[in-house]
Amino acid sequence: MANTKKTTLDITGMTCAACSNRIEKKLNKLDDVNAQVNLTTEKATVEYNPDRHDVQEFINTIQHLGYGVAVETVELDITGMTCAACSSRIEKVLNKMDGVQNATVNLTTEQAKVDYYPEETDADKLVTRIQKLGYDASIKDNNRDQTSRKAEALQHKLIKLIISAVLSLPLLMLMFVHLFNMHIPALFTNPWFQFILATPVQFIIGWQFYVGAYKNLRNGGANMDVLVAVGTSAAYFYSIYEMVRWLNGSTTQPHLYFETSAVLITLILFGKYLEARAKSQTTNALGELLSLQAKEARILKDGNEVMIPLNEVHVGDTLIVKPGEKIPVDGKIIKGMTAIDESMLTGESIPVEKNVDDTVIGSTMNKNGTITMTATKVGGDTALANIIKVVEEAQSSKAPIQRLADIISGYFVPIVVGIALLTFIVWITLVTPGTFEPALVASISVLVIACPCALGLATPTSIMVGTGRAAENGILFKGGEFVERTHQIDTIVLDKTGTITNGCPVVTDYHGDDQTLQLLATAEKDSEHPLAEAIVNYAKEKQLTLTETTTFKAVPGHGIEATIDHHHILVGNRKLMADNDISLPKHISDDLTHYERDGKTAMLIAVNYSLTGIIAVADTVKDHAKDAIKQLHDMGIEVAMLTGDNKNTAQAIAKQVGIDTVIADILPEEKAAQITKLQQQGKKVAMVGDGVNDAPALVKADIGIAIGTGTEVAIEAADITILGGDLMLIPKAIYASKATIRNIRQNLFWAFGYNIAGIPIAALGLLAPWVAGAAMALSSVSVVTNALRLKKMRLEPRRKDA
């Protein structure tokens, strides 16, 4: 091969020589490819013709065979981006680099997330490439206080704005002369006075625009800095030209536009300051999550209690937590009992009772007892750290709805410069032939009114605020893509056990005396069956003392038989009683039928061959399940239940909560196929489950929603995780998605509408440059401000007919 490139890929999933041979054979079947796969190093070295192939093709081939290619992810902090054209250009350049699988750049967070192949490139190369484009970049430091960094940057912007405003304010007086025919001191109209004030604004305060424009143009791009630099420079240097004419006596009334250039820069800085201030508020939800973390822990060392920083706690350390203190890390209680406020995770305000061997979650509040615990998860592995990670990823991700804005942003500035040039030509040749000033003013107005910033901020700011607000309510979206897809859902499939129900059987009905219950619980206490556990717990709640069984025998399909303290015990169904010649009174038979119809497991109890009781056990429906399903129906969403239980039990549960569609007798591996059937009917389906035995169905659904327990926030199969198991959060998640997408559409409508309307108005000469500059400055502020309205949204779904 004359023109060749070589790449090395890390391969995962190979177990033997057959694997490596299979991959090598498949790659070598491609034209102009020479591949060698080493099982020991788990690497594939591929020589290829870059005109015919790219690395992604080899990766797809390997993945199609069922193997993986190792990918690393790095997050980068980027400074110097001023508008969507900047972020769009950086993203485009990164995605063209060898070894980069995918790169996204977020203008709002000023961060990039890059997935890359470590054998092809590394984080330092990514940083260097961004720096060559004229921006500052560094690998994100998770230990660095991002809030204080942004506060410092905001303070710097404010200082520049104040200096610029002080210098521009006297020049602003000249505009009032033109507008209102006011009388002002002669000093204000003196060209030297205007020059002295405008020059530092143009070349010191406004130098950032020249630097940004130069860096972008040098790299073949154009951004907002180009528009500002060209527009203000045109006004400034035309004023210099007029001033020179005044100095050499060619004119006594120079037409100066120093106030235009200086006031434009001040207004744009004002807009950027307001924008940065508003953007800083979009990350409040993340800041609040970070503030929940404990700062230190009380560790037990050599019998002494010592306070240490949280980052020095290791797995296995013994910690002591006193009343009123936060649980420092995730762990297990080894001594003591208490009640813990877990509302930061579950939203449930009632403290949860905790005893020895119970799990405790870091950053929750210990209310009333001193406990000793063992650390099981620390640092980035804790539940709160996982929540923060999910929220960060969601806030830095892109929604598909942003693509159009990204495409337009890439061409926006060159098009605007072209329109400004055309405006100048039309004015100087057709509108006011031979008159320079009106043509200049109109073209400057076109340059400064155009705003690519609003386009770039329209989607990410809404995603940031929307996902942050959802996280505050225990709803974790894994990314912007899932926020967008969720609003399209028209069908929700709920797994029964652990989703609609509590997943823990309890005694719902009992008819009999305490002695019968005591004997029943004693007979069941050694069984590991969940129903037996429910009966034993019920007896303990009644404070009954359990003894020991003398004999025990399971009767397959019918029940159990036992001897306790010389009493013969039978527990089971009708058949067991009939086989032992025990007759059922009509009211007992009716109760049995009633319980079975309600989906409960009913058992008859006979002591010494005489019927003495009946007990019913069922997995109870969660609080608010019925209300949640009613809300989904009110939103026009179809709700179905999927379960492996028999149809009678399933129908009984469905009836309790108001579900019409029941899919019963389904094996776990068949759940995904049921989702596919619904999708084939043209439905957009969300699957709700616990992420364990229904993971394939969660993946298959358009949106997978996992019910987390607080410690399981990163369930891989899920697109959304609901903390705490409250089903009311499902309609809230859908409403949050709808509200966020509605907000994005409002922002995009404003951003597009503003430019579509504003540029022609400016080109017609109907706007003074300073008015156009003010409009441009406020346009991006209005987009961010509109997104911030989501911070106050009440997650209460609307009826479809409302």
From Swiss-Prot:
- What does the entry give for GO biological process? copper ion homeostasis
Q: Keywords in UniProt for this one?
A: ATP-binding, Cell membrane, Copper, Copper transport, Ion transport, Magnesium, Membrane, Metal-binding, Nucleotide-binding, Phosphoprotein, Repeat, Translocase, Transmembrane, Transmembrane helix, Transport
**Where is the protein localized?**
Cell membrane
| Residues that coordinate or bind Mg(2+) | 690, 694
| GO CC aspect terms | plasma membrane
The GO terms describing molecular function are: ATP binding; ATP hydrolysis activity; copper ion binding; P-type divalent copper transporter activity; P-type monovalent copper transporter activity
Note the SS bond partners. Answer: none
The record lists the catalysed reaction(s) as:
Cu(+)(in) + ATP + H2O = Cu(+)(out) + ADP + phosphate + H(+)
Enumerate the NCBIfam families for this protein. Answer: ATPase-IB1_Cu, ATPase-IB_hvy, ATPase_P-type, copper ion binding protein
Q: Which family does it belong to?
A: Belongs to the cation transport ATPase (P-type) (TC 3.A.3) family. Type IB subfamily.
Q: What is this protein called?
A: Copper-exporting P-type ATPase
The primary gene name is: copA
